[in-house]
């Protein structure tokens, strides 16, 4: 299965989301590319979900979104007028790798269990901007194991709900999914 309208930025985000959904998604190279595709591109007037790092870069298009919920490491946003959703991953001003480390800890494992560095800078260096990340057996094993994490399971549920309901999303139902423990 392929979800073209689900657009993660960077390779580790794409690898995790594809693993969680057990499907292909539409990789974008940056948060700006995700926003541009939603605001002016193919999905301008269509359903779309962007998945971006919650980093320091401010994207003007995101100012048209309202927060509909959050977890420790995920912020869920909905466009005021369109069927556009954005999920910011990680704590504020942090990259996806902080989300990964947090959720690996949540399932009682360590990065070393996947033969990956526990040092954040080293992990970022290993996972950033590399097509090989999507085929790396260590990364794939990590992403599969992370499905056990309650927060990753919530991400999976929200993405599956959005993909199944595209133009018929019940915001109250979505908020309940996000708030559920």
What are these regions (language model features)?
Residues 1-181:
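Acidic, divalent-metal-binding catalytic cores of TOPRIM
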């Amino acid at each position: 299965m392929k979800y073209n309208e689900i657009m993660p930025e960077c390779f580790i985000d794409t690898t995790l989301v594809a693993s969680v959904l057990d499907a292909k998604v539409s990789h974008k190279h940056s948060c700006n590319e995700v926003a541009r595709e939603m605001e002016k591109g193919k999905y301008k007037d269509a359903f779309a979900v962007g998945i971006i790092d919650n980093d320091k870069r401010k994207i003007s298009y995101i100012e048209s979104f309202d927060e509909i919920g959050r977890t420790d490491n995920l912020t869920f946003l909905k466009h005021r007028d369109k069927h556009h959703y954005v999920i910011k991953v990680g704590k504020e001003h942090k990259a996806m790798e902080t989300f990964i480390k947090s959720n690996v800890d949540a399932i009682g494992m360590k990065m070393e269990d996947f033969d990956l560095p526990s040092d954040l800078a080293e992990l970022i260096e290993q996972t950033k901007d590399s097509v090989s990340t999507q085929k790396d057996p260590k990364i794939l094993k990590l992403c599969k194991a992370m499905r056990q994490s309650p927060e990753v399971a919530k991400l999976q549920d929200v993405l599956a709900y959005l993909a199944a309901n595209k133009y018929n999303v019940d915001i109250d139902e979505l908020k309940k999914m996000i708030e559920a423990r």
